[in-house]
């Protein structure tokens, strides 16, 4: 039976949302086991049943203001560090946190470790496709690294391909390289060299360069980017979506009685748009290239988002995604 090590104290609404989400997932996936690291008293005040759940008492918490690497090294009894060591020592199969992103990435790299051959693990996020048909795409790297080399972007193309195949069940996923134009000759030295490396691998269904204005239209299944650019794109998408919904609400509320009546009539459609723009149903961001699944959900995650993130981790474990990664890179890198 697979076991997930959970940082129960990480996140804006921890441990409440974490425990509630884990319990919902436990009820849905009876073969999963959970190790909850954190303040046992606070956890038990929320927990309705400890079936398939083990609580490990810790005395420290890494908060959002802590410097990641220092916190990992100094707060040895923090819920995140203890959870990471549980994975490293083989007591758990995956690591999950809603807490400090940098600290989780540091724990993934320094404690869990990286797959042999992977020089820079990347952070993979799943985002919605905003077309009538719907769907989603993966963005990799979405913020684990500020600088990348062409070889690393090529590795991201491979990692994204295996993730899309194993977890999202997409056959022959389309891989695109984020650039400032679709023409092969456009881009920086980094993207030009990365383009050549990816295009040379016949095992990758490479659709070429893609522009940021098109990725929400579903032009590819996996978007490859350096971490700096990928993170900027991710935050621009999140910010635009949030701003658009606020603008729509403010416009309706300031339009007088007729505007409010119109808004009431449009409410079901507006809710559909909001739900389509939400990425919570796809789970968290995955540190691809680590020796085990290391998954980060948003700091403001509610119980529903925690549940979907556990579902995502369960899919990764059931499909044996890490073995496929490891076998490939051991043989080819």
Swiss-Prot record:
It holds the Pfam family FA_synthesis. It comes from the Bacteria. GO terms for molecular function: phosphate:acyl-[acyl carrier protein] acyltransferase activity. InterPro entries: FA_synthesis (IPR003664), Phospholipid_synth_PlsX-like (IPR012281). The keyword Phosphoprotein does not apply. Pathway: Lipid metabolism; phospholipid metabolism. GO terms for cellular component: cytoplasm. It catalyses: a fatty acyl-[ACP] + phosphate = an acyl phosphate + holo-[ACP]. Its EC number is 2.3.1.274. GO terms for biological process: fatty acid biosynthetic process; phospholipid biosynthetic process. It is found in: Cytoplasm. Keywords: Cytoplasm, Lipid biosynthesis, Lipid metabolism, Phospholipid biosynthesis, Phospholipid metabolism, Transferase. Homodimer. Probably interacts with PlsY. HAMAP family: PlsX. Belongs to the PlsX family. Catalyzes the reversible formation of acyl-phosphate (acyl-PO(4)) from acyl-[acyl-carrier-protein] (acyl-ACP). This enzyme utilizes acyl-ACP as fatty acyl donor, but not acyl-CoA. This is Phosphate acyltransferase. It comes from Ligilactobacillus salivarius (strain UCC118) (Lactobacillus salivarius). The lineage of its organism: Bacteria, Bacillati, Bacillota, Bacilli, Lactobacillales.
């Amino acid at each position: 039976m697979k076991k997930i090590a959970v940082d129960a104290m990480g996140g804006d609404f921890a441990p409440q949302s974490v425990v509630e989400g884990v319990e919902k997932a436990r009820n849905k996936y009876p073969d999963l086991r959970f190790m909850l690291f954190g303040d046992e008293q606070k956890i038990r005040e929320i927990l309705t049943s400890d079936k398939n759940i083990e609580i490990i008492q810790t005395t420290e918490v890494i908060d959002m203001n802590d410097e990641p690497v220092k916190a990992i090294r100094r707060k040895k009894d923090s819920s995140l560090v203890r959870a990471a060591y549980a994975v490293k020592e083989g007591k758990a199969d995956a690591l999950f946190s809603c807490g400090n992103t940098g600290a989780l990435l540091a724990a993934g790299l320094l404690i869990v470790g990286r797959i042999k051959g992977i020089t820079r693990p990347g952070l993979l996020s799943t985002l919605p496709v905003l077309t009538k048909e719907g769907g989603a795409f993966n963005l990799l790297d979405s913020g684990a690294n500020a600088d990348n080399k062409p070889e690393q972007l090529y590795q991201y193309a491979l990692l994204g391909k295996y993730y899309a195949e194993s977890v999202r069940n997409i056959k022959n996923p389309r891989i695109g390289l984020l650039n400032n134009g679709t023409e092969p000759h456009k881009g920086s030295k980094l993207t030009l060299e990365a383009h050549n490396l990816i295009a040379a691998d016949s095992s990758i269904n490479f659709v070429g360069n893609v522009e940021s204005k098109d990725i929400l239209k579903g032009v590819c299944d996996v978007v490859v980017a350096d971490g700096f650019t990928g993170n900027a794109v991710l935050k621009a998408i999140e910010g635009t979506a949030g701003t658009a919904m606020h603008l729509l609400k403010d416009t309706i509320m300031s339009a007088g009685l007729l505007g409010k009546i119109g808004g009431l009539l449009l409410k079901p459609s507006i809710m559909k748009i909001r739900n389509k723009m939400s990425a919570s149903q796809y789970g968290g961001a995955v540190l691809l290239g680590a020796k085990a699944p290391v998954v980060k959900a948003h700091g403001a995650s509610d119980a529903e988002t925690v549940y979907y993130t556990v579902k995502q981790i369960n899919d990764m474990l059931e499909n044996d995604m890490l073995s496929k990664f490891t076998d490939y890179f051991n043989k080819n890198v």
